């Protein structure tokens, strides 16, 4: 059973686009790394923030959207899965900024996800408008959220660790 599950997650399906197949495992590992990062962020928030429940609930909600993207990618709907996962990541970044405050490290989510979309072999008429909208959302977030007070006050060290993990990850 473990071998079957391993094959399902690591081998591209026949419906997977041929030009995506060489990168299938790398994309799957990227999803896995993101899940590990989410759990690490949630553990840090749980251990250091008194009012942790809403922040973690938001993280898990957008994590589920990204998880559906992972599932779609795994079963062969590569472009739909990647687009959905990127939209979930943008939602997570925006909610993070609103809840714990603006940090220059958090805007990297917008830029990284836009670049990811541009790098994968999705039709240009699909990926370019989405990538540009991600940058537009970032610009709007900067204009309206960079000077706002966070909903939750978190320790500076927690914000710094989250920022550094975002830069590295």
Question: Each predicted region: which residue ranges?
Answer:
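N-terminal juxtamembrane segment and adjoining first transmembrane helix
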Residues: 1-81
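Intrinsic-disorder/low-complexity, polar/charged segments
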Residues: 14-17, 51, 123-124, 154-157, ...
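Structural signal for the C-terminal ends of transmembrane alpha-helices
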Residues: 71-73, 119-123
């Amino acid at each position: 059973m473990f071998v079957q599950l391993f094959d399902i997650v690591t081998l591209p399906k026949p419906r997977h686009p041929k030009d995506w197949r060489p990168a299938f495992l790398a994309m799957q590992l990227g999803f896995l790394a993101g899940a590990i990062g989410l759990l690490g962020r949630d553990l840090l928030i749980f251990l250091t923030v008194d009012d942790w429940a809403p922040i973690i609930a938001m993280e898990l909600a957008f994590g589920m959207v990204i998880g559906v993207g992972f599932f779609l990618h795994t079963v062969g709907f590569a472009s739909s899965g990647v687009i959905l996962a990127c939209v979930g990541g943008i939602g997570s970044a925006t909610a993070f900024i609103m809840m714990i405050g603006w940090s220059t490290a958090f805007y990297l989510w917008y830029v990284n996800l836009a670049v990811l979309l541009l790098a994968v072999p999705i039709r240009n008429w699909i990926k370019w408008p989405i990538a540009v909208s991600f940058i537009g959302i970032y610009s709007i977030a900067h204009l309206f959220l960079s000077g706002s007070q966070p909903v939750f006050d978190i320790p500076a060290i927690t914000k710094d660790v989250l920022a550094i993990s975002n830069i590295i990850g």
